[in-house]
A protein has these predicted regions:
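Helix-to-loop junction immediately C-terminal to a conserved catalytic motif
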Residues: 55
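Conserved ABC transporter NBD signature motif
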Residues: 63-71
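Short coil-to-helix segment of the ABC ATPase nucleotide-binding domain corresponding to the Q-loop/switch region
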Residues: 101-109
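Catalytic Walker B motif of ABC-type/P-loop ATPase nucleotide-binding domains
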Residues: 166-169
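A short, proline-enriched helix->beta-strand linker immediately N-terminal to the Walker B motif
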Residues: 160-164
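The feature captures the beta-strand-to-loop junction immediately N-terminal to the Walker
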Residues: 40-42
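Conserved ABC ATPase signature
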Residues: 141-145, 149-151
Length: 255
């Protein structure tokens, strides 16, 4: 497999001299094409800062981040915008769908901006909608959808451009247990069947158990790493809980 993401000794500081907070402390790791990686850690551990640096929402203080061999820490504003649009897909906790557009139009928007022809857009939207089980809601507006439906539409929007990587920030945070399970099964489907590379930040061990590998962040450093291997999801969940306990608490309020 080829390396999609290479994080090389990155550090991130906030504040000014005399009052500096180190949010990320010399983190390095790689993500291979087709991996589903979860990131967990206590509140304030640096996990969201890490995702923000990878997504170019924030900038690193030092170190390098390569996506498909390109050092994104060196990109200028115009190139950054193109990189975000074409190389990354985003799934947010609050969906970020446009209320005035239907599900179909929300999913297709990025392709429209990229000037993909209408026939190709129609083909790709319907293929992904079928894969995620949302064909019946393509004509609905966000206010007509449940939270789970909105998040699956957001997932379709994230994958529609065939990005190098999908970044998900607490994707189940606003969902009930049934909708959460449906979304996680959708992400699992994107990973297994469409070979999407996914990096997901979550505080929840159940959510994390759908990933194939977990990075645990503590005090801005990688504290531990788990690889699912041949474990069932339940077995992997139990291993995750063991690490959560080592981090100093239970699944409900520490991560």
């Amino acid at each position: 497999m080829s390396t999609v993401l290479k994080v090389d000794d990155i550090q991130k500081y906030y504040g000014k001299k005399g009052n500096i907070t180190k949010a990320i402390d010399s983190i390095s790791f790689e993500v291979e094409n087709g991996e589903f990686v979860g990131v967990m850690g206590p509140s304030g551990s640096g996990k969201t800062t890490l995702l923000n640096c990878i997504s170019t929402i924030d900038t690193v203080s030092s170190g390098f981040i390569h996506v498909d061999g390109k050092d994104i820490t060196k990109l200028k504003a115009k190139a950054l915008a193109k990189f975000r649009r074409e190389e990354l897909g985003f799934i947010f906790q609050d969906f970020n769908l446009l209320d005035t557009l239907t599900a179909y139009e929300n999913i297709a928007l990025a392709l429209t901006v990229m000037k993909v022809n209408h026939k190709e857009i129609h083909k790709r939207v319907n293929e992904i909608a079928n894969s995620l089980g949302i064909q019946e809601i393509l004509s609905k507006y966000p206010y007509e959808m449940s939270g789970g439906e909105k998040q699956r539409v957001a997932s379709a929007r994230a994958i529609i451009t065939n990005p190098s990587m999908i970044l998900a920030d607490e994707p189940t945070g606003s969902l009930d247990s049934k909708s959460s399970r449906m979304l996680l099964e959708s992400l699992e489907n994107l990973n297994n069947n469409l070979k999407a590379t996914i990096m997901m930040v979550t505080h929840d061990a159940f959510t994390a158990s759908y990933a194939k590998r977990i990075l645990f962040i503590k005090d801005g450093k990688i504290f531990n790493e788990l690889i699912r291997g041949n474990d069932s999801r339940k077995e992997f969940f139990n291993r995750i809980i063991e690490v959560v306990t080592l981090l100093g608490g239970d699944n409900n309020n520490v991560l």
